[in-house]
Amino acid sequence: MEPHREQGVIGLMYHKFDENKYPSTNVRMKDFKDQLKMIRKMKLDFISIEEFDDYVHGHRELYNKRVLLTVDDAWASFYRHAWPILKKEGIPFVLFINTREINQKNKNYMSWAQIREIHESGLGVIGHHSYSHDYIVGWEENRLRADLERASQDFRRELGSIPEYFSYPFGEYSLEFKNIVKDMGFRLAFGQHSGVVDSRKDRFELPRFPINENWGKADRFEMVLNTLPMPYKEFLPADKKVSEFKNPPQLEIEFVPGLKNLKNIVCTTNDGDSWPTVPLRFVSENRVVLDPINPYRVRTARINCSFADSPKHFRWLGIQFVLPHISADK
């Protein structure tokens, strides 16, 4: 299938369920149930991680849009509220687990017994989310590898095997981190930048739409389900880690041919509490250069690009950079 004709896979990322004190990482159960109904109403099918793996490795074509459901951190509220619904409805999902809190028997997290229940269900697949769930980008390589290996030992002890799929803590990754994840044998790795997965996507920079109390509202969730991929041939810079000496970075993207209305692309970026438009210019029919104006003052820098493919469907590309020299509190 030609890249511009792919409808792709919408990755949804959840954390907490009905923990209303944490709106940025929580989804209300009423909203979650409504979201599942909306997915069914729009006649979208869920995809298992095994089928998704085949798709991004080029072993399977998808002729209709699919939805991949993922959950990060193994909060107890997932097991208490969402797991019974997913089990009843037979919805496949991936549960990414950071093992330190599980080992410590933190009451806010699931237990190893509960994780084994999901692992053995044939429905939920357990993913790797590091040991500490710390701000890892910027660590020395030995320390980074030791953290991941410690979690791998926990998985081997408790589940009998090491997960094949990885989720970067806080969605942060650098070229070095990505290469370490590859070297350790993982098949896929997910970030927290928004966007639709197409078959050309880097298998170690896979996007997901974070769903929370804001993005979980019906109108915004419907918009997410109506998005299409924005496939590209080349993306520069290859490293998503930004040094204080190259802040802000210049971006250059070569999109695939055939993207209708690409000339209408608009990109915005987070600058404090606002999302100003990023100046851009076409250097060829399908190649765009983005020149953010102001240096980023936050550790996590985001750029979102979109344009209308039809009155109801937008193409969407989310980008996340990490500035490890800036405190995570900013």
PLM-predicted stretches and their roles:
Residues 1-65, 77-80, 84-110, 211-330:
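Terminal accessory/targeting
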Residues 71, 186-195:
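Acidic, His- and aromatic-enriched active-site or binding-groove loops in soluble protein domains
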Residues 7-23, 42, 63-67, 75-177, ...:
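Metal-dependent polysaccharide deacetylase catalytic core of the NodB/CE4 family, i.e.
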Residues 2-3, 195-198:
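A general structural signal for short secondary-structure junctions and capping/turn motifs
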